[in-house]
Amino acid sequence: MVDGKINVLYEDNHIIVVEKIRNVLVQADNTKDLDMLMLVKHYIKLKYNKPGNVYLGLVHRLDRPVGGIIVFAKTSKAASRLSKSISEHNWQKIYLAVLCGTLKGKGILEDYLKKNEKTNKTIVDKDGKYSKLEYEVLGCKANKTLV
């Protein structure tokens, strides 16, 4: 259960960086479930006692099940600059995952992946899009591996 509280990691006049809550959408969809965009807008509205609508630009996303760090733009100018920076590949994305079982060292996984729209899951399919994943084991404990 999410209580609607957000963890603000950084904030200035242009951006706000928050911890994305696992299993919470980044932006609203047809489920009407809680979403980070709404939570952060609410936070800004309360903190700064803002009347009316709060502008908040969404410049990147994380999948619903994933927790992590997400950056929102507080101005349209910041949104434009951040979007340009992302499209020019000036951002480096680093993902950490905890796996069941143990792996050792480093590796590369390559396959063809295709999204099943009905189940909203990705499967290996020879007609899918080529995908490559490089991983490095950072640690193991209790039959779990951090990569």
Regions found by a protein language model. Give the residues of each.
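RNA pseudouridine synthases
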Residues: 1-147
